[in-house]
Amino acid sequence: MKKLLIALISASLFQHASAKDAKIELTGNDQMQYNIKAFEVTEGQKVVLSFKHIGQLPAVAMGHNVVILAAGTGVPAFATKCAPAKANGYIPLDEESKKQMIAHTKLLGGSESDVITFTAPAAGDYPFICTFPGHFAIMQGVMTVKAK
């Protein structure tokens, strides 16, 4: 009984240590720049992404979001599909687009913030962009997912 209890406690501690969340803090500003262009997580890891628009301008003039795309998604083609989706914060709702997105924040104006949580997908490189019209050309980066 004592050995079983020790084994269960050890397994619980190991599981807790290996399940550590990845905490990512991204900002976007009125100069259309993210503070970081790349970050790294491990497949299967819980990712908590905090995004803050540190500029002053409102969302209608200089809105920013973070959209993490599936590996292999063509960024310019995806961004083009976002432009007409103003009513949804420039997030397209068609099924193909939904399959191309891993996660996304809300569209934010100056001083606003959002937090999203998702599970890191399989190992690979996943682009992230701002889908406000025209921003993707400058506001983009890569989430690298490492194998376990």
Each language-model region and where it sits:
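Extracytoplasmic/periplasmic copper-protein system
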Residues: 20-27, 69-92, 119, 123-125, ...
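N-terminal edge beta-strand
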Residues: 21-47
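Extended, low-complexity, turn-rich repeat/linker tracts enriched in Gly/Pro/Ser/Thr and Asp/Glu
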Residues: 55-59
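Short Gly/aromatic-enriched secondary-structure transition segments
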Residues: 61-69
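Sec-dependent N-terminal signal peptides
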Residues: 4-13
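Extracellular/periplasmic metallocenter environments
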Residues: 52, 99, 103-148
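Short beta-strand and strand-turn-strand segments in soluble, beta-rich domains
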Residues: 90-102
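Sec/Tat signal peptide C-region and signal peptidase I cleavage site
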Residues: 13-19
